[in-house]
């Protein structure tokens, strides 16, 4: 028989060990799950954009708030969430791991590694949705970001902190330009301290896994993966993860920007991102608008791209440069999403199928492409030769259309046409073969100065190969002087002699 003393002792222990703190949780119950959207009853204190946790550990984000229910987008497999499951509010916003530890890694839209390597230990996490820097915190674009592609660096220059859209039909070389730009940063990064390096982030949205694997292998082969983060939300991933991926990557890029470093981010592509958001919005029963997109599809991309900026010196002087990619249908740039992104960005690089099939690669339409702020970031040695090439090509395009209607062309016009054809040939460039600033200036200088006028158009590529080989082997000082913005009269005359010597051997 239990004595009264023992009972009192147990009661006393229970009272002493009682934790008086009351733990309050906002809890709801899943009513239905379909197409990646969970309808939950309860969660009265849930906030828009708040992360919630399901019973099995899967997370989601609140995107609709109704009287008695909330609609939650599930980040993960919907098969693991069932009717009647308990859902808890976390009182947190969506955040992802950021930092230098992620360089060289492949992660998913939640920041989890998917490359089969060990987990990374990052102490820093940043919210995926954050307000873009204000006007006072920014400064104008003043430093160039070299792509290594002649036609872009000379005619459509990109500066650090700029948003430059790459737009064109499928299979016109949009991704190739972005990957070439990432690979080109290797030579720059090898010459500067860590603070001045350009770190890169490539975001694959709705891409085939085979295509993404090919890009990762190319980055690894060229030694570019060591300063690059690859974020993947493939075609087999849910619409919610494809929607989240660009914001995840942008948060990772902001780590570099806000710590006084430089970062380049490629969104490939925002057309599929908009389609994923359209799918989510329709499933959330939001009213459709033009082309069935929701009314806030402009805000979807503007709040993402406005986070790319060149920060003021007070804020560390870091930069985040964005290269969003848009895929058009049959060259229609007046569609809803393309016009939205064109109006948000600081310029666009138009790629055309017709130019591509003519064999002009990269297939950039120089007449329609523009960079609104990048020209102020060009170095002087580039500006000296870039101005004359713009004029030459403008005159060539005008006369080319005119010459189609008649065979009789005066001597002056014929001279412009001949030089224009050689300049177009000179702007051709093979994929994965970026050129340094010095090499680009030397090649374009040869064309604009008339040294190629007597060379056959078919021999232009041969001339370029010989010139670059000669300069790299015997005159590296010329290339380094031009790259260091030191294109003096002495350098110009020495370069002219080298060009004349090679040109005369091909006449």
UniProtKB/Swiss-Prot annotation:
Alphabetized UniProt keyword annotations: ATP synthesis, ATP-binding, Cell inner membrane, Cell membrane, CF(1), Hydrogen ion transport, Ion transport, Membrane, Nucleotide-binding, Translocase, Transport
Binding site for ATP: 168-175
Membrane topology: Peripheral membrane protein
Site residues (Required for activity), renumbered to this chain: 369
Catalytic reaction annotation: ATP + H2O + 4 H(+)(in) = ADP + phosphate + 5 H(+)(out)
Assembly and binders: F-type ATPases have 2 components, CF(1) - the catalytic core - and CF(0) - the membrane proton channel. CF(1) has five subunits: alpha(3), beta(3), gamma(1), delta(1), epsilon(1). CF(0) has three main subunits: a(1), b(2) and c(9-12). The alpha and beta chains form an alternating ring which encloses part of the gamma chain. CF(1) is attached to CF(0) by a central stalk formed by the gamma and epsilon chains, while a peripheral stalk is formed by the delta and b chains.
One cellular-component annotation, GO: proton-transporting ATP synthase complex
Major place of residence: membrane
Keyword Membrane: yes
Family designation: Belongs to the ATPase alpha/beta chains family.
Family matches, as Pfam families: ATP-synt_ab, ATP-synt_ab_C, ATP-synt_ab_N
EC nos: 7.1.2.2
Record's function text: Produces ATP from ADP in the presence of a proton gradient across the membrane. The alpha chain is a regulatory subunit.
Listed name of the protein: ATP synthase subunit alpha
Organismal lineage: Bacteria, Pseudomonadati, Pseudomonadota, Alphaproteobacteria, Rickettsiales
GO MF entries: ADP binding; ATP binding; proton-transporting ATP synthase activity, rotational mechanism
Subcellular location: Cell inner membrane
Organism annotation: Ehrlichia ruminantium (strain Gardel)
């Amino acid at each position: 028989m239990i004595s009264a003393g023992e009972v009192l002792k147990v009661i006393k222990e229970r009272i002493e060990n009682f934790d008086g703190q009351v733990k309050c949780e906002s809890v709801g119950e899943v009513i239905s799950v379909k197409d990646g959207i969970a309808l939950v009853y309860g969660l009265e204190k849930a906030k828009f954009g708040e992360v919630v946790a399901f019973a099995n550990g899967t997370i989601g984000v609140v995107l609709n708030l109704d009287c008695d229910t909330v609609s939650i987008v599930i980040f993960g497999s919907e098969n693991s969430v069932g009717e009647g499951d308990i859902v808890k509010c976390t009182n947190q916003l969506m955040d992802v791991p950021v930092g230098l530890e992620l360089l060289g890694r492949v992660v998913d839209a939640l920041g989890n590694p998917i490359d089969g390597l060990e987990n990374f230990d990052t102490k820093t996490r940043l919210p995926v949705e954050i307000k873009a820097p204000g006007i006072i915190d920014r400064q104008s674009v003043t430093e160039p970001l070299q792509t290594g592609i002649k036609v872009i660096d000379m005619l459509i220059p990109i500066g650090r902190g700029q948003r430059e859209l790459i737009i064109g039909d499928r299979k016109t070389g949009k991704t190739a330009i972005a990957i070439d730009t990432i690979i080109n940063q290797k030579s720059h990064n090898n010459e500067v301290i860590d603070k001045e390096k350009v770190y890169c982030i490539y975001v694959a949205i709705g891409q085939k896994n085979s295509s993404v694997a090919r890009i990762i292998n190319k980055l690894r082969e060229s030694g570019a993966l060591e300063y690059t983060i690859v974020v993947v939300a493939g075609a087999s991933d849910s619409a919610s993860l494809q929607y989240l991926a660009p914001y995840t990557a942008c948060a990772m890029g902001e780590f570099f920007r806000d710590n006084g470093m430089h970062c380049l981010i490629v969104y490939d592509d925002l057309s599929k991102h908009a389609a994923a958001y359209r799918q989510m919005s329709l499933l959330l029963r939001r009213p459709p608008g033009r082309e069935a997109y929701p009314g806030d599809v402009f805000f979807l991309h503007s709040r993402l791209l406005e986070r790319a900026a060149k920060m003021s010196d007070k804020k560390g002087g870091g930069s985040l440069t964005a290269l969003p990619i848009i895929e058009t249908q049959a060259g229609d740039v007046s569609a809803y999403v393309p016009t939205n992104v064109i109006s948000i960005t600081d310029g666009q690089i138009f790629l055309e199928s017709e130019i591509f099939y003519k064999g002009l690669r990269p297939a950039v339409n120089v007449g329609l492409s523009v960079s609104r702020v990048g020209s102020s970031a060009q170095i002087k040695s580039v500006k000296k030769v870039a101005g004359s090439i713009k004029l030459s090509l403008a005159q060539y395009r005008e006369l080319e259309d005119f010459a189609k209607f008649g065979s009789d062309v005066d001597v002056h016009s014929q001279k412009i046409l001949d030089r224009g054809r050689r300049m177009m040939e000179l702007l051709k460039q093979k994929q994965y073969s970026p050129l340094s600033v010095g090499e680009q200036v030397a090649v374009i200088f040869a064309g604009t100065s008339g040294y190629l006028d007597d060379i056959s158009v078919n021999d232009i590529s041969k001339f370029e190969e010989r010139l670059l080989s000669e300069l790299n082997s015997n005159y590296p000082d010329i290339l380094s002087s031009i790259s260091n913005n030191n294109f003096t009269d002495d350098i110009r005359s020495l370069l002219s002699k080298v060009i004349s010597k090679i040109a005369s051997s091909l006449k």
